Amino acid sequence: MADISGNGYGNAREEVVMVNLKDEVEHQQEMEDIHNPRPLKKQDSLLSVSVPFLQKLIAEFLGTYFLVFTGCASVVVNMQNDNVVTLPGIAIVWGLTIMVLIYSLGHISGAHINPAVTIAFASCGRFPLKQVPAYVISQVIGSTLAAATLRLLFGLDHDVCSGKHDVFIGSSPVGSDLQAFTMEFIVTFYLMFIISGVATDNRAIGELAGLAIGSTVLLNVLIAAPVSSASMNPGRSLGPALVYGCYKGIWIYLVAPTLGAIAGAWVYNTVRYTDKPLREITKSGSFLKTVRIGST
């Protein structure tokens, strides 16, 4: 058999094969970069926004918009129609709205729709700190536009802060500032504690998160609305305040829910002592052991 490795044809053939292999490797690398893009460098990630992150911001904007629009619309309808909705009805509207938004947007953005929840998650390392400003801004914009929509839709009076017209869809203390602050702190603490339990703990039944959180909001509105307007959400209070220019007690609704949410998240993290599944905890529970031993 003739040796072709030393002649011109043999060398040219080897070069063609090597070039083809190189082109194929480069093509595969390009396809890999398309389907699995490499993470941006730190300095680039701060200047650019990915499409999935924009989708999350849009989800937070829409979620907060519909939350404030639906919940506050029930308040307006109740005020303008001789309390036809009633307090329990308003509480049900807020609770159901939260529930359906969690089920529809939770898989996209987490369905925070509340700056206090976003800040609380970030404080305990469950949410990227650098994404907090964008989330909060989206939520506040959604709340503000919802309040503006209601103002145009129902023709609400401009002079709502003077007390002459009792149709203000924002939040204001019914009693003293101390009562409102304390109530907002407690109900938001309770809400965030429940959120941490059903939405972040892998031992909980995640499918029931929306129902549990919505029910918590419903209960909180029932007990807190006559005292503090039951905000539990700085964005929900800030949006209407910006639209109406009415800032009475606004500091309460910015500070108390935020502190309450942070405290609720941290307290739950403190009592969350194990990562065992619920069935293992049940089997090894000291109470059940005692009962079984006593019964034998």
Swiss-Prot record:
A single BP term in Gene Ontology: regulation of defense response
Subcellular location: Membrane
Residues spanned by motif NPA 2: 233-235
N-acetylmethionine: modified positions: 1
Pfam families noted in UniProt: MIP
Tissue: Expressed in roots.
GO terms of molecular function: arsenite transmembrane transporter activity; water channel activity
Regions crossing the membrane: 57-77, 84-104, 136-156, 180-200, 205-225, 249-269
InterPro entries: Aquaporin-like, Aquaporin_transptr, MIP, MIP_CS
Annotated motif NPA 1, positions: 114-116
Membrane listed as a keyword: yes
Source organism superkingdom: Eukaryota
Record's keyword terms, sorted: Acetylation, Membrane, Phosphoprotein, Repeat, Transmembrane, Transmembrane helix, Transport
Protein family: Belongs to the MIP/aquaporin (TC 1.A.8) family. NIP (TC 1.A.8.12) subfamily.
Protein role: Water channel probably required to promote glycerol permeability and water transport across cell membranes.
Designated name of the protein: Aquaporin NIP1-1
Species the sequence originates in: Arabidopsis thaliana
This protein's encoding gene: NIP1-1
